[in-house]
């Protein structure tokens, strides 16, 4: 894990925080970069100390278990999602909807959805939405976030396609957010990073297994397997 002061923190409305009445939701694409990295995805903080919510995940067998918590109180929603299904296309959708009028919160991740009713919510909410490190929350997992949209009476769309700096603008170019220690993924599209390598004295081939997210490299007497989720390499000799 990286040092605490080097971990990413993204405050969505750092420069201009809107106020929502009756309803708002946020949705974004998320990708996991490690099946061994767990932690907090984001926090949503209201003006009232009792109205702070966070989204946490860890791994339970073949599932990713997401938990929406009301800080200092309880787990509101526990939502298991198939790890294989969610990670099949790299990105999967996450949506959290706050119905302020009906006092209920809905969590939808990939193709799974749950509703928690009876959550006392203010009819008007000025949310401080923070991804990653936030106050005492320092367990920042290895994830990526893309295409963030906050829906209310007005829709705020953040492509998150910046290439450098700490400023985050909406799709119209208006400054709203600030991010500390960002890693902008657009740069990785141009600057490739070597993950590993294989060599063989005899003729060799390779193929990719999409279901297992593995690359196979083989020659006449050996098979090497590189797992793209864990980075582990295993080898097997043919007999």
Locations of the language-model features?
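Glycan-recognition/cleft segments
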Residues: 42-70
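Repeated scaffold domains used in trafficking and secretory/extracellular systems
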Residues: 199-208, 239
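Short tryptophan-centered beta-strand motifs in secreted/extracellular beta-sheet-rich domains
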Residues: 89-100, 105-107
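Flexible glycan-contacting loops in extracellular carbohydrate-active proteins
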Residues: 116-144
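Extracytoplasmic low-complexity segments
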Residues: 1-15, 147-193
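Short, aromatic/His-centered strand-loop micro-motif at the edge of beta-sheets
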Residues: 68-93
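Short coil/turn segments that connect the beta-strands within blades of beta-propeller domains
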Residues: 211-213
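A carbohydrate-recognition surface predominantly in extracellular/luminal proteins
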Residues: 9-44, 52-55, 148
């Amino acid at each position: 894990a990286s040092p605490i002061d080097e971990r990413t923190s993204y405050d969505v409305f750092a420069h201009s925080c809107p106020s929502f009445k009756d309803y708002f939701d946020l949705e974004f694409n998320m990708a996991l970069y490690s099946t061994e990295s767990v932690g907090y995805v984001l926090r949503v903080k209201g003006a009232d100390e009792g109205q702070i919510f966070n989204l946490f995940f860890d791994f339970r067998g073949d599932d990713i278990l997401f938990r929406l918590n009301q800080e200092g109180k309880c787990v509101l929603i526990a939502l298991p999602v198939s790890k294989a299904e969610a990670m099949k296309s790299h990105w999967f959708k996450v949506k959290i909807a706050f119905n302020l009028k009906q006092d209920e919160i809905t969590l939808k991740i990939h193709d799974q959805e749950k509703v928690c009713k009876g959550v006392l919510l203010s009819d008007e909410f000025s949310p401080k939405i923070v991804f990653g490190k936030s106050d005492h929350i320092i367990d920042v997992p290895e994830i990526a976030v893309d295409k963030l949209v906050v829906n209310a009476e007005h829709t705020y769309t953040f492509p998150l396609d910046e290439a450098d700096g700490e400023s985050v603008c909406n799709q119209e170019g208006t400054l709203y957010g600030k991010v500390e220690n960002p890693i902008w993924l657009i740069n990785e599209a141009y600057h490739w990073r070597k993950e590993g390598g294989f060599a063989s004295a005899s003729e060799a081939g390779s193929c990719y297994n999409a279901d297992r997210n593995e690359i196979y490299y083989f020659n006449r007497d050996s098979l090497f397997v590189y797992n793209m989720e864990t980075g582990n390499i295993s080898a097997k000799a043919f007999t």
